[in-house]
Amino acid sequence: MTSIKPIHNGKKVIVGMSGGVDSSVSAYLLMQQGYEVEGLFMKNWEEDDTDEYCAAADDLKDAQAVCDKLGIKMHTVNFAAEYWDNVFEYFLAEYKAGRTPNPDIMCNKEIKFKAFLEFADDILDADYIAMGHYVRRRDNSDGSVQMLRGVDGNKDQSYFLYTLSHEQVARSLFPVGELEKHEVRDIAKQMGLITHDKKDSTGICFIGERKFTDFLATYLPAQPGDIETPEGEVIGKHQGLMYHTLGQRKGLGIGGLKDSNEDPWYVVEKDLLRNVLIVAQGGNHPRLMSQGMTVNQLHWVDRKGPATDSQLVVKTRYRQTDVPCRISFDDPQRITVIFDSPVAAVTPGQSAVFYDGDVCLGGGIIDSLIRG
């Protein structure tokens, strides 16, 4: 069993209980550390009576069972209105504009570490909040805090949390960030928690098990158009640019073509003006590669950000291998990033997150690409 030295005895922590194993073990570990722990379950999506996909009821039941087992209070709160206004509307607007958004990042920014923290403060009188994210917090001698990658490199979630402010990190605890995933499941099993073997949630929470294209079509009208090669040859039809992202290989519906080789086809560009999807063969096709990018809507955890001309590493998507790069500031809210070597399938609308070693510095939204 993992033992962690008691700290901050008696301080009150409100744990975001999702009904999953990570938040379950987070609550247990914080109790072991001497905190006064209570759970708070968020309902972020209002499904209708015919919605078979949302597991919120099951998750609530599991969260309550864990809190009962641990002997702690559990509260519930409905953030569906805030979620719709601040996460879902953004999600739709980005897809409508031809970009590929990341709603999980926006959910962390607007709901889990904003609305949740405000509720925990105003209603539950919290000293801290805690989540089951795989990141670490470092407390420095000067009173500052930093956000670090989780110990489990395969589960590290710092990419999704780069928008957190210094103040939010200072008010947040991340117990499972110090552990490997298998250790978390082992602890849950030893404690007899119902969530010990529960499958990890994947995908976008409000879509659940639904087919993504079907879900999106209920909110945004599809606009079919041509699929072209870089040379302008029409080789197929798409059902809507919003259903495709740069670097996509599957689901293009392109069969064997006369005079083409057997290399797979990849999306290399979305021509919004003409409503044309441009595809090319080979994962290293020049049209798929970028030498760099511009990034705007910047957010730095320490508020200052790195110095211009800093040598850092960046992730342009979750679980991507670190990409060495150099950054320069065009203005306080825009940087130019040059990669040490070309990178495939960098996607406007997605987040670029920067690191100095294990420290997550922050990041921003990919705006445009720099081609060779």
Curated annotation (Swiss-Prot):
Cellular compartments annotated: Cytoplasm
Disulfides per UniProt: C107-C205
A Gene Ontology molecular function term of the record: tRNA binding
One Gene Ontology cellular component annotation held by this UniProt entry: cytoplasm
Protein's UniProt keywords contain Phosphoprotein: no
Keyword RNA-binding appears in the UniProt entry: yes
Pfam families: tRNA_Me_trans, tRNA_Me_trans_C, tRNA_Me_trans_M
Annotated spans, Interaction with tRNA: 155-157, 317-318
Keywords: ATP-binding, Cytoplasm, Disulfide bond, Nucleotide-binding, RNA-binding, Transferase, tRNA processing, tRNA-binding
EC number: 2.8.1.13
Protein name: tRNA-specific 2-thiouridylase MnmA
Region listing for Interaction with target base in tRNA, in residue ranges: 102-104
Binding positions (ATP): G16, M17, S18, G19, G20, V21, D22, S23, M42, G132
NCBIfam families, per the entry: PRK00143.1, trmU
Annotated catalysed reactions: S-sulfanyl-L-cysteinyl-[protein] + uridine(34) in tRNA + AH2 + ATP = 2-thiouridine(34) in tRNA + L-cysteinyl-[protein] + A + AMP + diphosphate + H(+)
Role summary: Catalyzes the 2-thiolation of uridine at the wobble position (U34) of tRNA, leading to the formation of s(2)U34.
Family: Belongs to the MnmA/TRMU family.
Active site: C107 (nucleophile), C205 (cysteine persulfide intermediate)
Residues flagged as site, Interaction with tRNA: H133, Q350
Name of the coding gene: mnmA
Cross-referenced InterPro entries: MnmA-like, MnmA-like_C, MnmA-like_central, MnmA-like_central_sf, Rossmann-like_a/b/a_fold
GO biological process: tRNA wobble position uridine thiolation
